[in-house]
Amino acid sequence: MLTQTDNELICRTGPGTPMGEYLRRFWIPALCSDEISEPDSPPVRVKILNEELVAYRDTNGDVGLLDNYCPHRRASLFFGRNEECGLRCVYHGWKFDTKGDCVDMPSEPAESNFKDKVKIKAYPARDWGGYIWAYMGPAEFQPDLPEVGWAMVPDSHRKVSRRLQENNFVQGIEGGIDSSHISFLHFGLPPVLRDDPNYTGRTLTNTDSAPHFLVKNTDYGFVYGANREAENNSYYWRLTPFMLPFFTVIPGGSGDPDQRTYSGHGWVPADDESCWMFTYSWNASRPLNHGEGHDASFLKKEPRTLRAILNKDNDYGIDREVQRTQTFTGIDSISVQDSGIQESMGAICDRTKEHLGTSDSAVIAMRRIYLQACRDLLEGKEPFVPRKGSAYRVRSVADVMDRSVTFEENTKRVAVGVA
């Protein structure tokens, strides 16, 4: 459990909050690149870290991420005209470039220099690995982009998506680093996944529902291991890297680690009661096939809000007969099972009422890292992890191995290039 004070500390992410300032030290995904795929295409609303922004790609292909509200009379720039290397407010014609400079002010006299005195809030934005990334922190601490696996492969080798999840981002992360729940929440598979080679470990996760858990801190966050009993004096190991501030790589697949398809999620706060679940799948050795990738990439979403069609308003499509006869939940899709349960805890979970057990080792480790990071910032200590971009070249592990192979030996296999 957490105290109410600590719970508030890690869950509140607006400007000026300790957690919000910590997250702003990192490059974070704001939207998918294909949402603004063409120069001069329509701008897109973006809400991250409790800030309402608008993203656009200008005539030259450069990306702008601006305050949604024009500094003149606060009209929304979502309705603006994206033309001739700038976003123009349709209320009075003020126009802003990707750096936030006002480059045209047709409502003022031609001889006026007023436009030279007006700027709009603009954040550095980069097109990287299928996402538009934003840096929202102090300029003097801007790091290099993280070398995440899906960004290090050609476009055809990856798939990315995002959708809205209606709970605080911490709940999403806690689900992503909890290996124990797969033996229950995801017990039984929808037919489309029953023969999927990425789920060959399913039998082992179902037959041993109380695995042994270990955590090791790393330069990028930590790696979390769970081993389950397997045949022939072996363990089934699942190792999940947690990359600060909110990324995971899900254990799965089989065969040569360099040939596998990997998937993961990142949970980016929209505000304190909702988050964006970014999903990525990639294969370093070949292009992804049609239909390949995490099931979250294929969920039906409301086109304007990016909210899943199966949501709390329709109880996530739960089918009690399927629950009775086929799956543990009666809810279709692993991703909807996850988001449904995470949203059921409330917008911000009351962690003062929890009772954590040994299976919650990774959750406890993540909270400790967050709390310490917030306290360090309050004391003026800057985080070092954002400057460790090359440390993010990691992947998950899901393999049956001899009992003699230790957790420490297994953690070395998380680094890309180690068999």
Question: Predicted segment positions?
Answer:
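Alpha-helical interaction segments
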Residues: 16-17, 81, 86, 306
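Generic N-terminal leader segments that precede the first folded domain
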Residues: 28-30
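C-terminal catalytic domain of Rieske-type non-heme iron oxygenases
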Residues: 15, 37-38, 62, 139-419
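Short, flexible, glycine/charge-rich loop motifs used to bind or transfer phosphoryl groups or to couple energy/partner
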Residues: 18, 77, 162
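A boundary/linker detector
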Residues: 1-24
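A generic structural signal for short, non-catalytic loop/turn and secondary-structure boundary residues
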Residues: 21-23, 48, 118, 127, ...
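Rieske [2Fe-2S] iron-sulfur-binding domain
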Residues: 1, 11, 32-159, 212, ...
